[in-house]
Protein backbone atom coordinates (compact mmCIF):
# COMPACT_ATOMS: atom_id res chain seq x y z
CA UNK A 1 0.00 0.00 0.00
CA UNK A 2 1.40 3.40 -0.91
CA UNK A 3 2.02 5.75 2.01
CA UNK A 4 -0.48 8.41 0.93
CA UNK A 5 -3.22 5.87 0.34
CA UNK A 6 -2.47 4.23 3.67
CA UNK A 7 -2.79 7.52 5.50
CA UNK A 8 -6.12 8.25 3.85
CA UNK A 9 -7.31 4.78 4.85
CA UNK A 10 -6.37 5.37 8.48
CA UNK A 11 -9.25 7.80 8.90
CA UNK A 12 -11.70 5.09 7.90
CA UNK A 13 -9.98 2.49 10.07
CA UNK A 14 -10.15 4.76 13.11
CA UNK A 15 -13.77 5.52 12.41
CA UNK A 16 -14.88 1.90 12.34
CA UNK A 17 -16.79 -0.01 9.73
CA UNK A 18 -19.69 2.46 9.76
CA UNK A 19 -17.42 5.38 8.89
CA UNK A 20 -16.84 8.60 10.81
CA UNK A 21 -19.74 10.55 12.23
CA UNK A 22 -20.23 14.29 11.70
CA UNK A 23 -18.11 15.28 14.68
CA UNK A 24 -15.22 13.03 13.65
CA UNK A 25 -15.37 14.32 10.07
CA UNK A 26 -15.18 17.88 11.38
CA UNK A 27 -12.28 17.12 13.69
CA UNK A 28 -9.64 16.46 11.06
CA UNK A 29 -9.89 19.84 9.26
CA UNK A 30 -10.14 21.56 12.64
CA UNK A 31 -6.94 19.92 13.85
CA UNK A 32 -4.94 20.06 10.62
CA UNK A 33 -3.31 23.54 10.99
CA UNK A 34 -2.36 22.92 14.62
CA UNK A 35 -1.00 19.43 13.98
CA UNK A 36 1.04 20.35 10.92
CA UNK A 37 2.56 23.44 12.53
CA UNK A 38 3.78 21.35 15.45
CA UNK A 39 4.93 18.38 13.37
CA UNK A 40 6.89 20.58 10.98
CA UNK A 41 8.77 22.06 13.92
CA UNK A 42 9.45 18.59 15.36
CA UNK A 43 11.03 17.44 12.10
CA UNK A 44 13.98 19.63 13.03
CA UNK A 45 14.52 17.97 16.41
CA UNK A 46 16.56 14.81 16.79
CA UNK A 47 15.61 12.00 19.21
CA UNK A 48 16.99 12.26 22.72
CA UNK A 49 16.38 9.51 25.25
CA UNK A 50 17.11 9.19 28.95
CA UNK A 51 20.67 8.04 28.26
CA UNK A 52 21.50 11.64 27.33
CA UNK A 53 20.82 12.73 30.91
CA UNK A 54 22.97 11.03 33.58
CA UNK A 55 21.23 10.82 36.95
CA UNK A 56 23.87 10.93 39.67
CA UNK A 57 21.43 10.16 42.48
CA UNK A 58 19.89 7.12 40.77
CA UNK A 59 20.48 3.63 42.15
CA UNK A 60 20.09 2.30 38.62
CA UNK A 61 22.14 2.44 35.43
CA UNK A 62 22.20 4.78 32.44
CA UNK A 63 19.29 3.00 30.72
CA UNK A 64 17.05 3.10 33.82
CA UNK A 65 14.42 5.81 34.09
CA UNK A 66 14.90 7.91 37.23
CA UNK A 67 12.80 10.61 38.83
CA UNK A 68 12.30 12.04 42.30
CA UNK A 69 9.02 12.59 44.12
CA UNK A 70 7.56 16.00 43.35
CA UNK A 71 6.39 17.02 46.78
CA UNK A 72 9.42 16.01 48.85
CA UNK A 73 11.75 18.61 50.35
CA UNK A 74 14.76 18.82 52.69
CA UNK A 75 13.74 18.82 56.35
CA UNK A 76 14.73 22.18 57.92
CA UNK A 77 15.13 20.41 61.26
CA UNK A 78 17.45 17.79 59.71
CA UNK A 79 18.97 19.23 56.49
CA UNK A 80 21.03 16.14 55.69
CA UNK A 81 18.37 13.63 56.65
CA UNK A 82 15.37 12.12 54.89
CA UNK A 83 13.15 14.47 52.93
CA UNK A 84 9.68 15.44 54.17
CA UNK A 85 6.43 15.77 52.21
CA UNK A 86 4.72 19.06 51.32
CA UNK A 87 1.63 18.03 49.33
CA UNK A 88 1.00 20.06 46.21
CA UNK A 89 4.31 21.95 46.37
CA UNK A 90 6.79 20.78 43.74
CA UNK A 91 10.48 20.89 44.65
CA UNK A 92 12.30 22.55 41.71
CA UNK A 93 15.63 21.00 42.74
CA UNK A 94 14.52 17.41 42.21
CA UNK A 95 15.75 15.47 39.16
CA UNK A 96 13.20 15.64 36.33
CA UNK A 97 15.28 15.31 33.15
CA UNK A 98 14.19 11.76 32.35
CA UNK A 99 10.56 12.74 32.79
CA UNK A 100 11.06 15.74 30.52
CA UNK A 101 12.65 13.54 27.86
CA UNK A 102 9.74 11.11 28.07
CA UNK A 103 7.21 13.93 27.84
CA UNK A 104 9.03 15.30 24.79
CA UNK A 105 8.69 11.86 23.17
CA UNK A 106 4.99 11.86 24.02
CA UNK A 107 4.50 15.30 22.49
CA UNK A 108 6.46 14.78 19.28
CA UNK A 109 5.74 11.21 18.16
CA UNK A 110 1.93 11.49 18.36
CA UNK A 111 2.06 14.85 16.54
CA UNK A 112 4.18 13.32 13.79
CA UNK A 113 1.84 10.32 13.53
CA UNK A 114 -1.18 12.62 13.39
CA UNK A 115 0.46 14.71 10.67
CA UNK A 116 1.17 11.55 8.69
CA UNK A 117 -2.43 10.38 9.06
CA UNK A 118 -3.68 13.75 7.81
CA UNK A 119 -1.32 14.16 4.85
CA UNK A 120 0.27 10.85 3.91
CA UNK A 121 3.69 12.52 3.83
CA UNK A 122 6.33 9.90 4.56
CA UNK A 123 8.68 12.36 6.28
CA UNK A 124 6.43 12.50 9.33
CA UNK A 125 6.23 8.73 9.77
CA UNK A 126 9.95 8.32 9.15
CA UNK A 127 10.86 10.86 11.82
CA UNK A 128 8.46 9.27 14.30
CA UNK A 129 10.21 5.96 13.65
CA UNK A 130 13.58 7.51 14.48
CA UNK A 131 12.27 8.36 17.94
CA UNK A 132 10.73 4.93 18.38
CA UNK A 133 13.94 3.14 17.42
CA UNK A 134 15.99 5.31 19.79
CA UNK A 135 13.71 4.74 22.78
CA UNK A 136 12.66 1.12 22.35
CA UNK A 137 15.14 -0.68 20.06
CA UNK A 138 18.66 0.78 19.77
CA UNK A 139 20.97 -0.85 22.37
CA UNK A 140 22.95 2.33 22.95
CA UNK A 141 19.96 4.56 23.74
CA UNK A 142 16.90 2.47 24.62
CA UNK A 143 15.18 2.76 27.97
CA UNK A 144 14.91 -0.37 30.09
CA UNK A 145 11.25 -1.49 30.34
CA UNK A 146 10.72 -0.77 34.03
CA UNK A 147 10.27 2.15 36.41
CA UNK A 148 12.09 0.58 39.32
CA UNK A 149 13.83 3.86 40.16
CA UNK A 150 11.00 6.31 39.54
CA UNK A 151 9.95 8.87 42.15
CA UNK A 152 12.73 8.10 44.56
CA UNK A 153 12.85 10.02 47.85
CA UNK A 154 16.15 11.14 49.32
CA UNK A 155 16.93 9.16 52.46
CA UNK A 156 13.80 7.01 52.19
CA UNK A 157 13.58 4.91 49.00
CA UNK A 158 15.38 4.39 45.68
CA UNK A 159 12.04 4.09 43.87
CA UNK A 160 8.37 3.42 44.55
CA UNK A 161 5.11 2.44 42.96
CA UNK A 162 3.97 6.04 42.74
CA UNK A 163 6.55 6.51 40.01
CA UNK A 164 4.56 4.35 37.59
CA UNK A 165 2.46 7.40 36.81
CA UNK A 166 5.44 8.90 34.98
CA UNK A 167 4.77 6.62 32.00
CA UNK A 168 1.23 7.83 31.36
CA UNK A 169 2.98 9.66 28.54
CA UNK A 170 3.56 6.38 26.73
CA UNK A 171 -0.19 5.87 26.32
CA UNK A 172 -0.49 8.19 23.32
CA UNK A 173 2.86 6.98 22.00
CA UNK A 174 1.43 3.45 21.93
CA UNK A 175 -1.59 4.79 20.08
CA UNK A 176 0.65 6.51 17.55
CA UNK A 177 2.54 3.26 16.94
CA UNK A 178 -0.73 1.46 16.29
CA UNK A 179 -1.89 4.10 13.82
CA UNK A 180 1.40 4.04 11.95
CA UNK A 181 1.44 0.25 11.86
CA UNK A 182 -2.14 -0.02 10.61
CA UNK A 183 -1.17 2.16 7.67
CA UNK A 184 1.97 0.20 6.88
CA UNK A 185 4.33 2.98 7.97
CA UNK A 186 6.23 0.84 10.50
CA UNK A 187 8.08 -2.20 9.11
CA UNK A 188 7.09 -5.52 10.62
CA UNK A 189 10.52 -6.14 12.15
CA UNK A 190 10.51 -2.78 13.95
CA UNK A 191 6.95 -3.27 15.12
CA UNK A 192 7.85 -6.63 16.65
CA UNK A 193 10.69 -5.01 18.61
CA UNK A 194 8.49 -2.16 19.81
CA UNK A 195 5.81 -4.65 20.82
CA UNK A 196 8.43 -6.64 22.71
CA UNK A 197 9.40 -3.56 24.72
CA UNK A 198 5.80 -2.77 25.63
CA UNK A 199 5.08 -6.42 26.40
CA UNK A 200 8.03 -6.52 28.81
CA UNK A 201 6.98 -3.26 30.41
CA UNK A 202 3.41 -4.48 30.84
CA UNK A 203 4.74 -7.62 32.50
CA UNK A 204 6.71 -5.41 34.90
CA UNK A 205 3.63 -3.29 35.64
CA UNK A 206 1.57 -6.38 36.41
CA UNK A 207 4.10 -8.47 38.35
CA UNK A 208 6.63 -6.21 40.08
CA UNK A 209 6.15 -5.00 43.67
CA UNK A 210 6.18 -1.37 42.52
CA UNK A 211 3.69 -2.09 39.76
CA UNK A 212 1.33 -3.95 42.08
CA UNK A 213 1.62 -1.18 44.66
CA UNK A 214 0.47 1.34 42.04
CA UNK A 215 -2.30 -0.97 40.86
CA UNK A 216 -3.74 -0.96 44.37
CA UNK A 217 -3.61 2.83 44.82
CA UNK A 218 -7.08 4.17 45.55
CA UNK A 219 -6.94 7.44 43.61
CA UNK A 220 -5.77 8.70 40.20
CA UNK A 221 -2.65 6.54 40.49
CA UNK A 222 -4.74 3.38 40.40
CA UNK A 223 -6.71 4.80 37.48
CA UNK A 224 -3.54 5.56 35.54
CA UNK A 225 -2.19 2.05 36.15
CA UNK A 226 -5.28 0.59 34.47
CA UNK A 227 -5.06 3.13 31.65
CA UNK A 228 -1.45 2.21 30.94
CA UNK A 229 -1.92 -1.54 31.06
CA UNK A 230 -4.97 -1.20 28.81
CA UNK A 231 -3.11 0.90 26.25
CA UNK A 232 -0.05 -1.33 26.16
CA UNK A 233 -2.08 -4.54 26.10
CA UNK A 234 -3.99 -3.12 23.16
CA UNK A 235 -0.76 -2.52 21.28
CA UNK A 236 0.63 -5.97 22.02
CA UNK A 237 -2.60 -7.87 21.45
CA UNK A 238 -2.84 -9.11 25.04
CA UNK A 239 -6.58 -9.75 25.25
CA UNK A 240 -6.34 -11.25 28.75
CA UNK A 241 -4.88 -8.05 30.17
CA UNK A 242 -7.43 -5.97 28.27
CA UNK A 243 -10.23 -7.96 29.87
CA UNK A 244 -8.59 -7.66 33.29
CA UNK A 245 -8.61 -3.88 32.86
CA UNK A 246 -12.29 -3.84 31.87
CA UNK A 247 -13.12 -5.87 34.94
CA UNK A 248 -11.02 -3.64 37.18
CA UNK A 249 -12.68 -0.52 35.79
CA UNK A 250 -16.12 -1.90 36.68
CA UNK A 251 -15.31 -3.59 39.99
CA UNK A 252 -12.59 -1.36 41.45
CA UNK A 253 -12.26 2.07 39.86
CA UNK A 254 -15.90 3.09 39.61
CA UNK A 255 -16.97 1.64 42.99
CA UNK A 256 -14.03 3.00 45.00
CA UNK A 257 -13.32 6.35 43.32
CA UNK A 258 -16.65 7.73 42.17
CA UNK A 259 -19.15 9.28 44.59
CA UNK A 260 -22.91 9.27 44.15
CA UNK A 261 -22.85 12.81 42.75
CA UNK A 262 -20.19 11.96 40.14
CA UNK A 263 -17.26 13.55 41.96
CA UNK A 264 -13.96 11.95 42.90
CA UNK A 265 -13.70 12.46 46.69
CA UNK A 266 -10.08 11.32 46.89
CA UNK A 267 -9.11 13.98 44.34
CA UNK A 268 -11.23 16.66 46.03
CA UNK A 269 -9.31 16.01 49.25
CA UNK A 270 -6.00 16.99 47.63
CA UNK A 271 -4.42 20.44 47.55
CA UNK A 272 -5.18 20.65 43.81
CA UNK A 273 -8.77 19.41 43.77
CA UNK A 274 -9.78 20.96 40.45
CA UNK A 275 -6.71 19.83 38.51
CA UNK A 276 -6.73 16.35 40.01
CA UNK A 277 -10.45 15.93 39.28
CA UNK A 278 -9.86 16.84 35.63
CA UNK A 279 -6.84 14.56 35.46
CA UNK A 280 -8.63 11.53 36.89
CA UNK A 281 -11.67 12.09 34.69
CA UNK A 282 -9.45 12.23 31.60
CA UNK A 283 -7.75 8.99 32.65
CA UNK A 284 -11.10 7.26 33.22
CA UNK A 285 -12.33 8.49 29.84
CA UNK A 286 -9.19 7.26 28.11
CA UNK A 287 -9.68 3.80 29.61
CA UNK A 288 -13.16 3.76 28.11
CA UNK A 289 -11.89 5.02 24.77
CA UNK A 290 -9.33 2.22 24.62
CA UNK A 291 -11.43 -0.66 25.93
CA UNK A 292 -15.12 -0.03 25.24
CA UNK A 293 -16.69 -2.47 22.79
CA UNK A 294 -20.20 -2.96 21.49
CA UNK A 295 -20.64 -5.94 23.82
CA UNK A 296 -18.88 -4.39 26.83
CA UNK A 297 -19.42 -0.65 26.62
CA UNK A 298 -17.60 0.93 29.55
CA UNK A 299 -19.04 4.31 28.62
CA UNK A 300 -22.58 3.23 29.43
CA UNK A 301 -21.67 0.92 32.32
CA UNK A 302 -23.08 2.00 35.66
CA UNK A 303 -23.47 0.53 39.12
CA UNK A 304 -26.97 -0.14 40.46
CA UNK A 305 -26.90 3.28 42.15
CA UNK A 306 -26.15 5.02 38.84
CA UNK A 307 -22.45 5.71 39.28
CA UNK A 308 -20.60 5.62 35.96
CA UNK A 309 -18.96 7.79 33.34
CA UNK A 310 -22.14 9.63 32.44
CA UNK A 311 -22.52 10.86 35.99
CA UNK A 312 -18.82 11.74 36.27
CA UNK A 313 -19.01 13.88 33.13
CA UNK A 314 -22.25 15.49 34.25
CA UNK A 315 -20.62 16.47 37.55
CA UNK A 316 -17.49 18.06 36.08
CA UNK A 317 -18.69 19.60 32.81
CA UNK A 318 -20.43 22.62 34.42
CA UNK A 319 -17.23 23.53 36.26
CA UNK A 320 -15.22 23.25 33.05
CA UNK A 321 -17.72 25.51 31.32
CA UNK A 322 -17.71 28.03 34.17
CA UNK A 323 -14.91 27.54 36.66
CA UNK A 324 -16.20 30.36 38.85
CA UNK A 325 -18.94 27.96 39.98
CA UNK A 326 -16.39 25.54 41.47
CA UNK A 327 -17.53 25.15 45.10
CA UNK A 328 -14.35 23.54 46.43
CA UNK A 329 -10.90 24.88 47.32
CA UNK A 330 -8.69 26.45 44.66
CA UNK A 331 -5.58 24.55 43.58
CA UNK A 332 -2.45 25.65 45.45
CA UNK A 333 -0.44 25.67 42.19
CA UNK A 334 -1.30 26.31 38.54
CA UNK A 335 -4.95 27.01 39.29
CA UNK A 336 -5.19 29.61 36.54
CA UNK A 337 -3.90 27.15 33.91
CA UNK A 338 -6.97 24.89 34.01
CA UNK A 339 -9.15 23.82 32.30
CA UNK A 340 -7.47 22.90 29.07
CA UNK A 341 -8.93 20.94 26.17
CA UNK A 342 -9.80 17.95 28.35
CA UNK A 343 -9.98 14.62 26.49
CA UNK A 344 -12.92 13.52 28.65
CA UNK A 345 -15.14 16.17 27.04
CA UNK A 346 -14.38 14.96 23.52
CA UNK A 347 -14.32 11.23 24.19
CA UNK A 348 -17.36 11.27 26.45
CA UNK A 349 -19.21 13.78 24.33
CA UNK A 350 -18.90 11.56 21.26
CA UNK A 351 -19.53 8.25 23.05
CA UNK A 352 -22.47 9.40 25.17
CA UNK A 353 -24.07 11.79 22.68
CA UNK A 354 -23.28 14.91 24.67
CA UNK A 355 -22.80 17.46 21.85
CA UNK A 356 -22.53 20.37 24.27
CA UNK A 357 -19.40 18.75 25.74
CA UNK A 358 -17.84 18.42 22.29
CA UNK A 359 -18.70 22.04 21.52
CA UNK A 360 -17.15 23.12 24.82
CA UNK A 361 -14.02 21.08 24.08
CA UNK A 362 -13.55 22.99 20.83
CA UNK A 363 -13.48 26.32 22.69
CA UNK A 364 -10.73 25.36 25.13
CA UNK A 365 -6.99 25.86 24.83
CA UNK A 366 -5.26 22.89 23.18
CA UNK A 367 -1.62 23.51 24.06
CA UNK A 368 0.42 25.03 26.86
CA UNK A 369 4.02 26.10 27.40
CA UNK A 370 3.74 25.44 31.15
CA UNK A 371 5.63 22.24 32.00
CA UNK A 372 3.20 21.15 34.71
CA UNK A 373 0.24 21.49 32.35
CA UNK A 374 1.97 19.56 29.58
CA UNK A 375 2.78 16.87 32.10
CA UNK A 376 -0.83 16.47 33.18
CA UNK A 377 -2.47 16.73 29.75
CA UNK A 378 -1.50 13.36 28.34
CA UNK A 379 -3.95 13.19 25.39
CA UNK A 380 -2.95 15.84 22.86
CA UNK A 381 -3.74 14.40 19.42
CA UNK A 382 -7.45 13.60 19.08
CA UNK A 383 -6.96 12.71 15.41
CA UNK A 384 -5.35 9.48 16.63
CA UNK A 385 -8.23 8.59 18.91
CA UNK A 386 -11.62 9.40 17.43
CA UNK A 387 -13.60 6.51 16.06
CA UNK A 388 -17.01 4.92 16.25
CA UNK A 389 -17.56 1.99 18.66
CA UNK A 390 -16.41 -1.26 17.14
CA UNK A 391 -13.54 0.21 15.15
CA UNK A 392 -10.11 -1.41 15.24
CA UNK A 393 -9.19 0.50 18.39
CA UNK A 394 -12.58 0.46 20.01
Label each region the model flagged:
Residues 1-3:
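N-terminal export leaders
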Residues 5-15:
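Bacterial N-terminal signal peptides
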Residues 14-212, 223, 250, 292-295, ...:
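Extracellular glycan-targeting catalytic surfaces
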Residues 95-96, 184, 188, 206-217, ...:
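Active-site-adjacent structural elements in folded domains
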Residues 227, 231-327:
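Long, repeat-rich segments with strong aromatic
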Amino acid sequence: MKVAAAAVAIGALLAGASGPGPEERGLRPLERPRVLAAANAYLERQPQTITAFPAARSAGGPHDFFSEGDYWWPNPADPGGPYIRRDGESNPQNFVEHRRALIRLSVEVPALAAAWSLTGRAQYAEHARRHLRAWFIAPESRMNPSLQYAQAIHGITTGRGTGVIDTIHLVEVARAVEVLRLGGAVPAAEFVEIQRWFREYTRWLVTSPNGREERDAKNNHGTCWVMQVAAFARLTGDRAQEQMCRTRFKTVLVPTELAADGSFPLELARTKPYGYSLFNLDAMATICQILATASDNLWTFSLPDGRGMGRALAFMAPYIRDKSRWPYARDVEYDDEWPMRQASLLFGGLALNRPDDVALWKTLKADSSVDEVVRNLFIRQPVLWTQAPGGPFG
